[in-house]
Regions:
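Solvent-exposed loop/turn and edge beta-strand elements of beta-rich ligand-binding domains
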Residues: 1-216
Length: 216
């Protein structure tokens, strides 16, 4: 086993030559990187220093945003009238922005995004109610809803998510957030007044009817 790499990323060892070729294999990696599982053949030369460069890939992440909302799926008719039935379903056409919730720093210490910087604008959910942002550096992010689908209320909700290192054998970190929105609602008020005096009158009874087809 060779010593760990130093500040320059180098490690060396002196061995007695008992064969022409040995192999070099990475055992562990610095935090934030993926383990290189390849074995490198190294040909030994007496009295010479043989060099081998091993390059590690940084662990990256993907972030998926899911959108749910109530959809009219039916109606129940009773003696008291009609009550609508709503079901929570996936929603398309929701729009989101992603921001850095803290400085986003690569594994080698490079600052990729400063805190509050815009990482991606205009992420829009598809027919499956989701949208995915790939190739993110590990760190803390904020997802903010910019626009809700038709008939749903956009409150400008924000959610924070931390994409953390998952170990040297995990190729990609997967993270997700789910947004749920209330449907837009309407209320109808009816007031009964005397035509001449404009006083409010008790006892009036009214029915509310559909002016056109209401479809689920």
């Amino acid at each position: 086993k060779m010593p760990a790499t130093d500040a320059n990323g180098a490690s060396s060892v002196t061995i007695t030559k008992t064969q022409d070729t040995v192999y070099l294999k990475e055992i562990s990696v610095p935090n934030g990187y993926l383990l290189d599982t390849k074995a490198y053949d190294v040909k030994l030369v007496i009295g010479d220093t043989v060099k081998q460069t091993v390059t590690d890939a940084e662990q990256m992440a993907s972030l998926t945003v899911y959108k749910l909302g109530e959809v009219l799926t039916g109606a129940k008719v009773t003696d008291d009238g009609v009550s609508f039935v709503y079901t929570e379903q996936k929603q398309k056409s929701a729009v989101y922005n992603v921001y850095a919730a803290a400085d986003i720093v690569s594994a080698d210490g490079t600052v990729i995004y400063k805190k509050d910087a815009l990482v991606k604008a205009g992420l829009t959910t598809g027919d499956d109610g989701s949208v995915t942002l790939d190739n993110l550096y590990l760190g803390k992010y904020v997802v903010k809803e910019m626009q809700a689908p038709q008939n749903l209320v956009c409150t400008g909700e924000s959610q924070e998510i931390t994409l953390s290192y998952a170990g040297s054998n995990v190729e990609k970190v997967m993270g997700s957030v789910t947004f749920k929105n209330d449907r837009q609602k309407a209320s109808v008020s009816v007031y009964k007044q005397d035509k001449e005096t404009r006083k409010y009158l008790p006892g009036g009874t009214y029915g509310l009817y559909a002016g056109n087809d209401i479809k689920a």
